[in-house]
């Protein structure tokens, strides 16, 4: 059978390249290769014959072309299967904005604890624009075995040659350790699964890596603040920056999450919050936000947080809202300007947040345009003037109809 032959060939390629491709093809269940309802022998044959006509060797195409082609296919799948896409694909405009906030430099270490197909790490490599300075600097962990294999292939096809993608449950078993402590990174970024249930709260409550330093949400609450605390503990104490996508509920939910949020505010690591438009993410109608944290705030940012309302900064399309490059630039400029802009941004002090009982809901802070309210006496005057004008118009029309003989006087 042709599919078995292909599977054997893929496994042979994997065995011949253990340093870069180990586990990439064998991570897929045999059913993926042998399901004739999805890919018949005839279609496989046609596909092989078509690809055989193309020159796809390293000498024919650059890594960017091959990598972008692979990424295109990943996005195409995400477009066609929105319900399942959220677990592995983050819209590239969101990724671009997060990487711009982090501003990774050549030589910085970059870590994604929920890396999906590796898109955030690839964008970081593009941003640094120096492949040699990213060697050994890119790290990712992904729970899903097949998705972690896709991530490794994705980075490989984008020209990555020295990166580390591991498979495992980050919250239960973080893979990156140094001297039995969490490894620290210059840049930490992720779009973890929103409000993940049954994520391992019991073990996290006595976490040996200290990731529960501000508290432990329950399994029913979801893992949002567990992810955030893991990422904060993974930041380099001196240079660490962190950008994470979370549901907007983390900004105002009470109970244990409210207590953790209070500690987050008082730590003064939080530099910017961006409330995003709805309908941008696959597979969820939940409104999301980006939290940007910095262990090395500039002097004029200390004790302050920039709140950005980007809920109206998007480009509508038929199937899904998107953020264009222009939209991303507008949001990023609101952060770099770090100023008050009516209906768009507000720089608040920690004291102002304390006065709001540590709620970080954007609409509590960003100023809205003042609507002009017409005094009641003016409304009354305008009403009677309009009523009088209507009566005069009716009288004039009646007069014309009488003159024309259309109605009797």
Question: Where is each model-derived feature located?
Answer:
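Short, flexible segments with low predicted structural confidence
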Residues: 40-41, 66, 70, 123, ...
């Amino acid at each position: 059978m042709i599919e078995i032959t292909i599977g054997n060939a893929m496994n042979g390629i994997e065995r011949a390249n253990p340093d870069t491709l180990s586990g990439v093809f064998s991570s897929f269940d045999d059913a993926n290769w042998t399901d004739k309802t999805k890919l018949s022998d005839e279609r496989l044959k046609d596909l092989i014959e078509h690809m055989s006509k193309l020159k796809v060797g390293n000498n024919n195409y650059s890594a960017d072309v091959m990598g972008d082609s692979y990424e295109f296919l990943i996005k195409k799948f995400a477009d066609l299967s929105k319900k399942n896409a959220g677990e592995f694909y983050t819209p590239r405009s969101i990724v671009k904005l997060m990487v711009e906030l982090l501003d990774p430099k050549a030589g910085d270490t970059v870590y994604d604890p929920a890396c999906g197909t590796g898109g955030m790490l690839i964008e970081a490599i593009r941003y640094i624009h120096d492949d040699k300075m990213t060697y050994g600097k890119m790290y990712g962990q992904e729970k899903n075995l097949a998705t972690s294999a896709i991530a490794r292939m994705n980075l490989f096809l984008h020209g990555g040659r020295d990166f580390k993608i591991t498979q495992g449950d980050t919250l239960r078993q973080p893979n990156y350790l140094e001297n039995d402590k969490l490894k620290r990174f210059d840049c930490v970024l992720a779009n973890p699964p929103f409000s993940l249930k049954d994520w391992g709260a019991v073990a996290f409550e006595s976490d040996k890596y200290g990731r529960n330093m501000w508290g432990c949400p329950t399994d029913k609450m979801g893992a949002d603040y567990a992810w955030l605390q893991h990422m904060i503990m993974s930041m380099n104490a001196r240079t660490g920056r962190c950008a994470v996508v979370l549901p907007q509920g983390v900004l105002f939910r009470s109970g244990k999450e409210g207590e953790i949020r209070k500690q987050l505010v008082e730590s003064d690591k939080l530099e910017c919050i961006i409330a995003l438009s709805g309908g941008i993410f696959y597979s969820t109608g939940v409104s999301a936000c980006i939290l940007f944290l910095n262990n090395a705030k500039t002097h004029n940012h200390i004790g302050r947080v920039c709140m950005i309302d980007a809920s109206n900064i998007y480009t509508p399309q038929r199937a899904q809202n998107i953020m264009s490059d222009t939209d991303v630039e507008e949001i990023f400029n609101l952060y770099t300007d770090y100023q008050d802009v009516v209906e768009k941004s507000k720089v608040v002090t920690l004291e102002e947040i304390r006065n709001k009982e540590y709620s970080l809901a954007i609409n509590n802070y960003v100023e809205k345009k003042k609507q002009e309210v017409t005094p009641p006496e003016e409304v009354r005057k305008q009403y009677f003037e309009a009523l009088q004008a209507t009566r005069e118009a009716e009288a004039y029309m009646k007069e014309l109809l009488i003159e024309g003989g259309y109605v009797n006087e």
